[in-house]
Amino acid sequence: MKKKIGLLVMAYGTPYKEEDIERYYTHIRRGRKPSPEMLEDLTERYRAIGGISPLATITLEQAKKLEKRLNEVQDEVEYHMYLGLKHIEPFIEDAVKEMHNDGIQDAIALVLAPHYSTFSVKSYVGRAQEEAEKLGNLTIHGIDSWYKEPKFIQYWVDAVKSIYSGMSDAEREKAVLIVSAHSLPEKIIAMGDPYPDQLNETADYIARGAEVANYAVGWQSAGNTPDPWIGPDVQDLTRELNEKYGYTSFVYAPVGFVAEHLEVLYDNDFECKVVTDEIGAKYYRPEMPNASDAFIDCLTDVVVKKKESVM
C-alpha cells in the first residue's frame, strides 16, 4: 500500500461573499474591527472588480489540480491535499487538524507565494508546524521559496514575451516592464529579510529571458499603517519613469502573486491604469498563472523536489 503524504496548500484567503468582508478584515487586523470608512473603502474595491474576488475559486482549483498532477507523475506515494488559509476558513490550523485526523504523518507545505518573507511564508509554515507539534505524530516540511523554479520564470518570460510580440519596434523602444510584488513594512529589511532581494532577482531572470532591456522593480498594495512600507509604489514609479525616460507603454508583471484577485484586478488594472491614462501611456498586464497547466507543472516540480530532499 502506498504511503499517504499530506499536501498542505496555503494561501492568504479572501471573502467568499460581501457579508464576509468585515470578519475577514477584522481577522487581518488581529481582532480589531475596521472603522465604517475603512470597511466601505474595501467593499467598494471589491464591487469595482465585480462584487467579490475570483481568488477563492482559483486557489481551490490550483490546489486540486496540483494534487491530481502529483499523483499522475509518480506512483511511490499518494498525495492528499488540504487547503489552509491565513485569514478565513478553512484556517491553516483546521487543515492540520484534518490531516492529523486522517492519520497523515508527513506533509509537504506549499505557500502560494513564490518569495520567502518572515511576514508571509515563515508565518504560514510556522502556524502549521505549531499546530502539528501540539497534535503530535505529524511532521510538516515547509517549502521556503520557489521563485527560482525554472518553470516559474519561464511562465513569466512567455507571458511578457506575448505582450511585447504584439508591439511595433517603435512602441517596444518606448516600453518598460514593471515587475512587482506586495509591499511589506520597511522594518523587514533591517531584519535581513530576503524578500526584496528575491524580487530583484526574479525581475533580472524574467527580463533576461524575455530579452527586455527596460525594466524596473516596484511595490504595490501597501497596508494602511503608520509604519513606512517598501517602495517605490508602482503608481509613483509609473509617473517617475514616464517623466524621466519618456516611456509611453507600461507592462505590469505582478509576479509576487499567482492569481487574479483584488491586488491585481484593482491595484493594477484599475489604479495603475488610471495613472497610464492620465499620462497618455498604454497599459498592459500579462495573464496571471491562475490554474494554467504550465503553472501547475511548475508547482508539481517544486513539491516533488521538496519531497525527495526530506523523505
UniProtKB/Swiss-Prot annotation:
The keyword Metal-binding applies. Its EC number is 4.99.1.9. It holds the Pfam family Ferrochelatase. Pathway: Porphyrin-containing compound metabolism; protoheme biosynthesis. It catalyses: Fe-coproporphyrin III + 2 H(+) = coproporphyrin III + Fe(2+). InterPro entries: Ferrochelatase (IPR001015), Ferrochelatase_AS (IPR019772), Ferrochelatase_C (IPR033644), Ferrochelatase_N (IPR033659). GO terms for biological process: heme biosynthetic process. Fe(2+) binds at residues 182, 263. Disulfide bonds: none annotated. It is found in: Cytoplasm. It comes from the Bacteria. GO terms for molecular function: ferrochelatase activity; metal ion binding. Gene3D superfamilies: 3.40.50.1400. CDD domains: Ferrochelatase_C, Ferrochelatase_N. Keywords: Cytoplasm, Heme biosynthesis, Iron, Lyase, Metal-binding, Porphyrin biosynthesis. One of its GO terms (cellular component) is cytoplasm. Its main location: cytoplasm. Fe-coproporphyrin III binds at residues 12, 29, 45-46, 53, 124. Belongs to the ferrochelatase family. Involved in coproporphyrin-dependent heme b biosynthesis. Catalyzes the insertion of ferrous iron into coproporphyrin III to form Fe-coproporphyrin III. This is Coproporphyrin III ferrochelatase 1. The lineage of its organism: Bacteria, Bacillati, Bacillota, Bacilli, Bacillales.
